[in-house]
């Protein structure tokens, strides 16, 4: 009869094995849940009353199937003038400014032994409010750039900075966000008021194909005249003035060497007072 009974030791061994297996499975599930790998980056919200969504970090502008758009509708983001960053590639997917990984040494005070170390930028993942888009934009941003955004008055003002240093700080991702907010009616109206203040005519559809160099040259001429207090001249007035100078140079003959002769001419001897 004793051969048919199960020993208590075997029962304890079986129970211990089951508990260990269950605990291991739970730990594996927790490790999978705590993984740092992100499947989707920057899931941006939809922009209200607009068919153009916020672009992805990869540079593509997704158009959902439910969005009614024409067949010939094509979105092309202008290429970033400074190209992708070759150092610290992570900065291509966020607003990092000019931040890089800094390398240095830890020096012992007792025996001056040096050990290599590095300082990484303080990168945060934030939801920044865009006034022109009317939504929160998800992006990685450093604390130094956050300070600059607060100083200039918001995300839109930071992205619309026109100086070369600001454009370099934006990086490829900031350049795409800059392009997106420039498509909003609020920013277009703002640019139209700036053109009117500079004395430039309102922008027409045929002016869309004008090269960037011509537009910058036109703004530069009007801006210099506006800074000097003169009345800014329109494009037609500048063209008429150029034609008039060309015709004048063809009809009149300029005397060469007259100024040099006057420069070398001796002054008459002063007369003595009686």
From Swiss-Prot:
Residues 249-274 are annotated as: Disordered. GO terms for molecular function: structural constituent of ribosome. The keyword Ribosomal protein applies. SUPFAM superfamilies: L28p-like. It comes from the Eukaryota. Component of the mitochondrial ribosome (mitoribosome), a dedicated translation machinery responsible for the synthesis of mitochondrial genome-encoded proteins, including at least some of the essential transmembrane subunits of the mitochondrial respiratory chain. The mitoribosomes are attached to the mitochondrial inner membrane and translation products are cotranslationally integrated into the membrane. Component of the mitochondrial large ribosomal subunit (mt-LSU). Mature N.crassa 74S mitochondrial ribosomes consist of a small (37S) and a large (54S) subunit. The 37S small subunit contains a 16S ribosomal RNA (16S mt-rRNA) and 32 different proteins. The 54S large subunit contains a 23S rRNA (23S mt-rRNA) and 42 different proteins. This is Large ribosomal subunit protein bL28m. It comes from Neurospora crassa (strain ATCC 24698 / 74-OR23-1A / CBS 708.71 / DSM 1257 / FGSC 987).
């Amino acid at each position: 009869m004793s051969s048919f009974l199960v020993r208590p030791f075997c029962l304890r061994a079986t129970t211990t094995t089951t508990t260990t297996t269950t605990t291991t499975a739970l730990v594996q599930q927790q490790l999978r849940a705590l993984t740092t790998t992100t499947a989707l980056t920057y899931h941006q919200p939809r922009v209200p009353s607009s068919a153009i969504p916020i672009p992805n970090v990869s540079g593509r502008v997704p158009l959902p199937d439910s969005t009614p758009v024409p067949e010939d509708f094509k979105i092309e983001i202008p290429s970033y003038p400074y190209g992708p960053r070759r150092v610290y590639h992570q900065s291509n997917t966020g607003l990092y400014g000019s931040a890089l990984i800094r390398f240095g040494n830890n020096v012992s005070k007792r025996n001056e032994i040096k050990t290599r170390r590095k300082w990484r930028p303080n990168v945060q993942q934030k939801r920044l409010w865009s006034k022109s888009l009317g939504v929160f934009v998800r992006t990685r941003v450093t604390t130094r750039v956050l300070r600059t955004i607060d100083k200039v008055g918001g995300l839109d003002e930071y992205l619309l900075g026109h100086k070369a240093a600001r454009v370099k700080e934006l990086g490829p991702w900031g350049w795409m966000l800059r392009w997106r907010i420039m498509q909003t009616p609020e920013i277009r109206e703002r640019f139209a008021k700036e053109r009117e203040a500079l004395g430039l005519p309102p922008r027409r559809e045929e002016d869309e194909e004008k090269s960037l160099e011509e537009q910058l040259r036109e703004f530069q001429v009007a801006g210099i005249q506006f800074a000097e207090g003169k009345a800014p001249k329109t494009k037609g007035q500048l063209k008429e003035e150029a034609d008039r100078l060309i015709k004048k140079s063809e009809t009149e003959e300029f005397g060469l060497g007259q100024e040099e002769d006057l420069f070398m001419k001796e002054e008459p001897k002063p007369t003595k007072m009686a």
